[in-house]
Amino acid sequence: MDKFTTHTGVGIPLRRSNVDTDQIIPAVYLKRVTRTGFEDGLFAAWRNDPSFVLNNEGYAGASVLVAGPDFGTGSSREHAVWALQNYGFKVVISPRFADIFRGNSGKAGLLAAQVDESVVQKIWDLLDEHPGTAVTVDLESRTVRAGEGVDAIEASFDIDDYTRWRLLEGLDDIGITLGHADAIASYEATRPSWRPATIHAH
């Protein structure tokens, strides 16, 4: 998992609330056995509508999704995070996230930045008026900045210290485990040989 410190990218306004994981990626797209290739299923039902924001060329290459409250509700679905990442999103900004989605995001390297609802509304308005506007998210200072000059919007965002640490260090669950490799090896070296053990796959 790559380390996350700051990211600047085109912001895209998703003016919808209560977006659940089945809307993010329908279950029919969950049959792959890898973590890649899910971008085609992202918001699949909505993308059939030519007026849907992801179909607007003004937001081409967007990597910062600015969504309404209660984003990522519904069933726990890592694929929802993977679909967002496969599409190119590095950050989702919302006034409120479902706990499970926020947890899955942190483990996979997608930053879920929680800001006040009034901030989301201001960013939406700015992005609507100026498609292609860049949004900078700084994890070290926990700040979001959209636009430049007198029209710029800057605000702090909330993220728990543990998830922030994982993202800054680029640590997924396997990375955290490998950080204890010496202790694990030391334990295994003194473990009685008659006890059950796993073996390396060939």
Curated annotation (Swiss-Prot):
The lineage of its organism: Bacteria, Bacillati, Actinomycetota, Actinomycetes, Propionibacteriales. It is an enzyme of class 4 (lyase). Its EC number is 4.2.1.33. NCBIfam families: leuD (TIGR00171), PRK01641.1 (NF002458). GO terms for biological process: L-leucine biosynthetic process. Pathway: Amino-acid biosynthesis; L-leucine biosynthesis; L-leucine from 3-methyl-2-oxobutanoate: step 2/4. It comes from the Bacteria. PANTHER family: 3-ISOPROPYLMALATE DEHYDRATASE SMALL SUBUNIT, 3-ISOPROPYLMALATE DEHYDRATASE SMALL SUBUNIT 2-RELATED-RELATED. It comes from Nocardioides sp. (strain ATCC BAA-499 / JS614). This is 3-isopropylmalate dehydratase small subunit. InterPro entries: 3-IsopropMal_deHydase_ssu, Aconitase/3IPM_dehydase_swvl, AconitaseA/IPMdHydase_ssu_swvl, IPMI_Swivel, LeuD. Catalyzes the isomerization between 2-isopropylmalate and 3-isopropylmalate, via the formation of 2-isopropylmaleate. Belongs to the LeuD family. LeuD type 1 subfamily. Keywords: Amino-acid biosynthesis, Branched-chain amino acid biosynthesis, Leucine biosynthesis, Lyase. Pfam families: Aconitase_C. The keyword Amino-acid biosynthesis applies. It catalyses: (2R,3S)-3-isopropylmalate = (2S)-2-isopropylmalate. One of its GO terms (molecular function) is 3-isopropylmalate dehydratase activity. Heterodimer of LeuC and LeuD. One of its GO terms (cellular component) is 3-isopropylmalate dehydratase complex.
